[in-house]
């Protein structure tokens, strides 16, 4: 998925109606590049408060296993409250970016961060890509866009909770730009903080998550 460089622009309209243009660049990692894999034709755009159908469609594209990895519990459906929470975006404290297949004009992934009110430079982050599009670079594109927007609005630290068995999340974290702080690790959940910055090689990450927890 890192065999090409994808560029584009995502425009955010804030609550003060100021339009912000954010360039998106997905850079290849020298250890991960695979020239035989093309980054697909995907448009990125900000998720809007009225995009509950798009959020529902991405959720519907996740199998039971993917849902458990994303939500860390069995999640057969999204409730009305879930949808309200997931679409309560303001492009500053709650930012979400939607990936849409250009050919099919259908949502295929979403990445978001929600700022910590007690620590304004920190935000919780989550990424979901429908099963049919996993492993094709969509998560990487979404994460790159999310990092750029975070830096624009003063977020310097991402926190995340994930299953140690979530290979896609491990790959994204392995290539993420910045320094990783390990917060907690047990059989079910791994919690990390990512201080945003330049990419840092971290071969220890896979070894850490693969080892038995005592």
Language-model regions: role of each:
Residues 4-21:
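Short, Lys/Arg-enriched N-terminal segments with co-localized hydrophobic residues
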Residues 17-214:
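Long, contiguous binding/interaction regions
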């Amino acid at each position: 998925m890192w065999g090409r460089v994808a560029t584009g622009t995502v425009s955010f309209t804030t609550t003060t109606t100021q339009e912000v243009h954010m360039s998106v660049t997905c850079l290849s990692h020298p250890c991960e590049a695979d020239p035989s894999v093309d980054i697909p034709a995907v448009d990125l755009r900000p998720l809007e408060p009225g995009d509950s159908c798009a959020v529902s469609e991405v959720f519907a594209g996740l199998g039971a296993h993917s849902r458990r990895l994303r939500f860390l519990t069995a999640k057969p459906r999204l409730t009305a409250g879930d949808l309200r929470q997931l679409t309560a975006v303001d492009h500053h404290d709650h930012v979400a970016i939607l990936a849409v297949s250009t050919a099919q004009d259908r949502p295929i992934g979403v990445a978001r961060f929600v700022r910590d009110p007690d620590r304004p430079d920190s935000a919780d982050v989550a990424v979901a890509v429908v099963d049919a599009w996993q492993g094709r670079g969509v998560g990487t594109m979404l994460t790159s866009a999310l990092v750029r927007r975070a830096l624009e609005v003063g977020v310097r630290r991402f926190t995340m909770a994930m299953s140690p068995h979530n290979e896609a999340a491990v790959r994204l974290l392995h290539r993420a730009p910045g320094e990783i702080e390990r917060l907690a690790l047990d059989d079910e959940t791994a919690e990390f903080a990512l201080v945003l910055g330049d990419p840092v090689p971290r071969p220890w990450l896979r070894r850490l998550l693969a080892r038995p927890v005592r």
